């Protein structure tokens, strides 16, 4: 079969027709290798966005991004989980998932956290980790050591996806969301089989969870807060797409289901990484309120995804215990010391 040409692919998007799996693999390899011109890369990614990317197109693109990535080899992945968001929710909340990372590890799961610098928020996960004193530029083997010994490994996305340099200028100049915004969370370099993923639009809940299903994930929760948050929200109901035992089901959860008080995002907003760090540290040091509640809720969901907890309720209880005991704060201190020692 003759490979699809970029011009044919562009025409498909204009006609709102799907680019099939093998064609998308070929096209994505051209993009990631720098073979495709910036003009065609921009045209095709914009065309895909306008027609709306299909599960098949997203799955194929994620497979190629994984092919081109620098991987972290983790041998025991039974309770390995990633907690990640697509970003783009515009809520400017503090680093909820980064804070939850320490709670999750303290409660017995292992976290391979995959993230970058700020895209739409005031503070990205890499910005937050750096502000806390974590060394984020480690080699893949060192990150694997961190996961094994501390229970947390932070993978700074640009270090693991060098081929993205071929796309970065196009993405920056376009300034609109493209397929790459939803590929990052699907391409964990440590191959975490379990994931809690927040998305920026309700349509993506069903799409991303089915892409994860096709990509071989084991236990996944894809969530969208009805108030627009790409986390499990305290301010509204949260749509959930869950992949478990090979099957997908979709449902909605509410804070009061877990005995938590509803709270809007205003109390969680920050203006810069300094404010985000202060709120994050407050949670780890025992401050009560909406920030603590939303961290526990999301950490609890990740513990359920990691198969450490039997249910969301059990996960929440374990997360609350990890914070109350001081174990989550100790986990942060352990990670800082360990990464600084490795980087020395």
From Swiss-Prot:
Pathway assignment: Amino-acid biosynthesis; L-tryptophan biosynthesis; L-tryptophan from chorismate: step 2/5
Residues annotated as binding anthranilate 2: 171
Major enzyme class: transferase
EC nos: 2.4.2.18
Catalytic activities: N-(5-phospho-beta-D-ribosyl)anthranilate + diphosphate = 5-phospho-alpha-D-ribose 1-diphosphate + anthranilate
Entry superkingdom: Bacteria
Cofactor(s), names only, from the UniProt record: Mg(2+)
UniProt similarity note: Belongs to the anthranilate phosphoribosyltransferase family.
Protein name per its UniProtKB record: Anthranilate phosphoribosyltransferase
Organism field: Acidovorax ebreus (strain TPSY)
